[in-house]
Amino acid sequence: MKPSIILYKTLPDDLLHRLEAHFTVTQVPNLHPETVARHAQAFSSAQGLLGASETVNRALLEKMSALRAASTISVGYDNVEVDALTARKIVLMHTPAVLTETVADTVMALMLATARRVVDVAERVKAGEWTESIGPAWFGVDVHHKTLGIVGMGRIGMALAQRAHFGFTMPVLYHARRRHQEAEDRFNARYCDLDTLLQEADFVCVILPLTAETRHLFGATQFARMKSSAIFINAGRGPVVDENALIAALQNGEIYAAGLDVFEQEPLSVDSPLLNMSNVVAVPHIGSATHETRYNMMACAVDNLIDALQGKIEKNCVNPQAAG
């Protein structure tokens, strides 16, 4: 008899068939309490859980007494209570490697869009404001040869440093929990403390997960340390930044512009002051959102769950100690 799993994300037919070859699959739209109650038997007997974005917490786990493995279609897992999974000997799998290059492309796009004011001037053209040769009011700033500061030198940080160093001849500064010798050797990146990075960088790019230590890591003090010409990019997690402090820094001219893929509350409220600022490029958490990469993430998550329920957790496991 096949193990049973709960699938709370729509998959392409070929990936669904791959799952069905190994498991009895119950598809649900979400993990809301009413959904769990409606499918109580399926949840209580499920050994696997696969999907994205929904909260996986102790209350849910209490309804899933047979659960052995959860697989998230993401690299981040701040919506999952990992400690609760580990305490119940449930492994959590994620998809860290397949989205690296795509997210780095998104960060580079935000850097270019903010510096060259692409969104702002494009909207002005559409509004019929281009009636004569443009002047300084339409100008942006250069990207090439500017100093890039990367906060969080993981896979994505490395991919961004590669683009900046080789493609735009940008000096690279970085701040991370530990020094990254490969970044220093390949890109001549310079490790520094956060304050030094903020003071010297023309672009401050945040690529951090959300943890107790990183929540509101960027607030009024940090923005005050940045150059008034600096551009701030957040492609990590929204709550890493105190959004009110960011808004104030932009309004007060403490920094030049911001490119934001993530926010404290998502979706972003329609009355957010960020949406009325011409020097802000706000996009809806599209870091990995290409057809190719999202398919690859789903395929990776499927394979992760198959492997995990066969006891294979050598790669992509967040909490391997749970299997011990």
Swiss-Prot record:
<dbReference type="InterPro" id="IPR050223">
    <property type="entry name" value="D-isomer_2-hydroxyacid_DH"/>
</dbReference>
<dbReference type="GO" id="GO:0120509">
    <property type="term" value="F:hydroxypyruvate reductase (NADPH) activity"/>
</dbReference>
<dbReference type="GO" id="GO:0051287">
    <property type="term" value="F:NAD binding"/>
</dbReference>
<keyword id="KW-0521">NADP</keyword>
<dbReference type="Pfam" id="PF00389">
    <property type="entry name" value="2-Hacid_dh"/>
</dbReference>
<dbReference type="InterPro" id="IPR023756">
    <property type="entry name" value="Glyo/OHPyrv_Rdtase_B"/>
</dbReference>
<comment type="subunit">
    <text>Homodimer.</text>
</comment>
<dbReference type="InterPro" id="IPR029753">
    <property type="entry name" value="D-isomer_DH_CS"/>
</dbReference>
<feature type="active site">
    <location>
        <position position="237"/>
    </location>
</feature>
<dbReference type="GO" id="GO:0005829">
    <property type="term" value="C:cytosol"/>
</dbReference>
<dbReference type="InterPro" id="IPR006139">
    <property type="entry name" value="D-isomer_2_OHA_DH_cat_dom"/>
</dbReference>
<dbReference type="GO" id="GO:0005886">
    <property type="term" value="C:plasma membrane"/>
</dbReference>
<dbReference type="InterPro" id="IPR006140">
    <property type="entry name" value="D-isomer_DH_NAD-bd"/>
</dbReference>
<protein>
    <recommendedName>
        <fullName>Glyoxylate/hydroxypyruvate reductase B</fullName>
        <ecNumber>1.1.1.79</ecNumber>
        <ecNumber>1.1.1.81</ecNumber>
    </recommendedName>
</protein>
<keyword id="KW-0560">Oxidoreductase</keyword>
<dbReference type="GO" id="GO:0008465">
    <property type="term" value="F:hydroxypyruvate reductase (NADH) activity"/>
</dbReference>
<comment type="function">
    <text>Catalyzes the NADPH-dependent reduction of glyoxylate and hydroxypyruvate into glycolate and glycerate, respectively.</text>
</comment>
<dbReference type="Pfam" id="PF02826">
    <property type="entry name" value="2-Hacid_dh_C"/>
</dbReference>
<dbReference type="GO" id="GO:0030267">
    <property type="term" value="F:glyoxylate reductase (NADPH) activity"/>
</dbReference>
<dbReference type="InterPro" id="IPR036291">
    <property type="entry name" value="NAD(P)-bd_dom_sf"/>
</dbReference>
<comment type="similarity">
    <text>Belongs to the D-isomer specific 2-hydroxyacid dehydrogenase family. GhrB subfamily.</text>
</comment>
<keyword id="KW-0520">NAD</keyword>
<keyword id="KW-0963">Cytoplasm</keyword>
<feature type="active site" description="Proton donor">
    <location>
        <position position="285"/>
    </location>
</feature>
<feature type="active site">
    <location>
        <position position="266"/>
    </location>
</feature>
